[in-house]
Amino acid sequence: NLVDADDELVAVVNGKFGRRFKRIAQRHCEVTAVEFDWGNPIDVDAVAAAVSDDTEVVTLVHNETSTGLLNPAKEVGEIAADHDARFIVDGVTCIGGDEFLMDEWNVDIAVTDGQKALAAPPGVSALWVGEGVAKHLDGENAPFYEDLDWHRRKADQHQTPFTSAIPLIRGLAVAVEEIRHEGMGERIGRHREQSAAFREAMEALGLTLFAQCNDVSDYSNTLTAVRLPEGARGEDSDAFFDAVADRGVSISGGQAHLGGDIFRVSNMGNLTTAQLARGVRTIGEAFNEVGVDADTAAGVDAVETRLR
């Protein structure tokens, strides 16, 4: 909708979902990828060096859940705006659970899904398209279903271009009403406190966080990535994940080349302190079961003390 085949796009990549954004763009235009090792913070100077007045679009995943890192949307947005480039941000795992300032960050298009921090059923997505970028849309060059001009016209009529997924939209409406009831500020604060408590708990267990932060990148407030310790890495990780599942708790492993190296735990949605403490206890007990020393009591105490 925003590029032709010979247009230039800069994709910022430091995880699986940034890489996916890059691969999507490569099907439609010329792409310059500014890539960093997964889990490492973004060097905004490197991004600034890659973006020029010829750049049409800059893409960024704000909350990279493959690594548990919150990327610097504000700083990258300023770079895009300095060159009059459109700024497209993947906000899938932060919108509804963390701050997302579209105007202040110069965001032109934001993307999210229902099933992440909004805590709605999977299957429904949403785009926010800024008025300033609407005039740049060219639906004729987009796949038929993804013609944003068409979607915008239908949205003005409170419709979708094709048959609406009414049950999913109603589910999303209920989830949004729950957010309204809690209050957006309170919800963001809760996610931040819960993620901080979980990180403290992992360190109390004797574990090491995976993401590397700097002055403009920070830990994700909706998901934590943790290094698997010796004795539960690589092929040995299967026994750990089985021990967690046997206790009725669901966590995720690393994606792509990080499989067997890390595990990931989400605190998106409507978790309680008791649920978070149960998750920490389960992780500690699972490590102990497979022969890894973890101070389960200290981990649970860290969560309960922080969130008391």
Regions found by a protein language model. Give the residues of each.
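Conserved active-site segment immediately N-terminal to the catalytic lysine
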Residues: 103-115
